[in-house]
Structure formats: structure tokens, C-alpha cells
Amino acid sequence: MLEIKNITKTFNKGTVNEKKALRGVNLTLNDGDFVTVIGGNGAGKSTLMNVISGSYEADTGKIFLDGKNITHLKEHQRARTIGRLFQDPLRGTAPNMTIEENLGLAYSRGKRRSLTIGIRKKDVSVFRERLKELDLGLEDRMKMPVGLLSGGQRQALTLLMATIVTPKLLLLDEHTAALDPKTAEKVMRITEKIVKENALTTLMITHNISNAIEYGNKTIVMSQGKLLLTIEGEQRANMTVEKLMKLYSDTAEDELSDKMILQE
């Protein structure tokens, strides 16, 4: 369970470039919630994820994960229980290491054992079975350097690495935005499968309005650093792209980008 209480974040405070990125954000994700996030440029979406992950420290407010106050924990400390994917497929993997070695690093997260001790045979079997679930043929290329994979393959692998040790929270920061539409759709299907099968509590920023209402069980709308709306239940079940766009335009202080509208 993730609880965010009255989080604020301001950049360049006291200067002409002051930017209030988060303005008293309150948000609760119950165990197993899959929440999608939409908003225009500068809405505070990525800043919110950076504050949750520990990349940025909030100015005020508190963050609790499974009842533990993580507000002042460093990013590497939170990484033991929080998985994260970024927009860039090149982030999150070591390109000169093999698929097997990358998975070995991910599998040792939070454990004392390191890769230098070697990857155990039973771990390799686990990796192979998990790779099969991606349906990309990567289980037959475990000795291949990750740098030789396509963007979609690499992002799918990164997703597996982020979840091979079940995290308490999964953060997806526009993780399909850099992929072509067909590949993005495949990665989203893989994402949905992994999230559902592991009942992962997930927060996903998306640039795709259709994805915002197709995946997950809740959608939140952000604008100008504030959480404006939470759409769930019957309202979300009956939501369409057109209705969501109108709802956004009626309540938000900014506009959705053309890219988001075209992605519908």
C-alpha cells in the first residue's frame, strides 16, 4: 500500500525560474491497484514518480509504503522494494552484459549475494522460465549482450528485471513512449500480464489516452502540480477517450499535448 500525504516540491525556489512542480498531492494506492496517470506537460507526473522513488526529496509531506515512512530514505534504499521503468529503453540495463547477467543483477537486489559469486544453475532455470513468459524468444539468447536487443525487447527485459524479485511498488514512467505503436502494444500486454499475475501495486504514467482507460483499475488526472481527479468504478468502466478528453478540458488548467490526442 502506498500513501502520499500532502507532498510538495518546488524547483529553483526564490528565483525568477521558480517552478511549483507538486502542490499538496495526496494519493493512496491499495495493494494490487494498477493506477494510470495522465496530464499535460509540466503537470508534475514525472516529478511525483521521482519523489516516490527517491530521485528527488519532497519539500514537505510524507510517503508511506506498506506502513513504513520512506520519506527520507535514499533512492538506493527504496530501490530494494520499488521497481521502475523509464521512457528510454536504454535505461535500466547494462548493455555490455548478457541477458543472463542482467537478470542475475536484478535477482540479487536486496540480497547479500552478488554477481561476482556467480549465477547458480537453479537461478538460470528461473530466468529461462520467466523469459519464456515474454514470448520474445529471449530464453534462447541468454548469453547475448543486451546492447544487441531491439528497443522493445530491451524494455520487456527491463520490465522483467524490475519485477523478477516482486517489488512492493512498480513505477512505469511512460515506458512505451519511445517504441513504435505495434511494439508498444506488445510491451503493454506483457506489462498487464506481469502486473496481474503478481498482483503488483502499480503506478503508470502514460502518453496514450486509450491506454489510460484500457489498463488498470483507476485513472488519475494531474494538472499544474495538483491531482485533480480520480476516475474509478462505474465511471471508469463507462469512460471513453472522448469523455476523458472533455473531462480533462473542463477541469485542467492546461491542455493535453497533440501527441497524447493523436495516440487515441
Which residues fall in each region the model found?
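ABC ATPase NBD coupling module
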Residues: 15, 19, 69-83, 91, ...
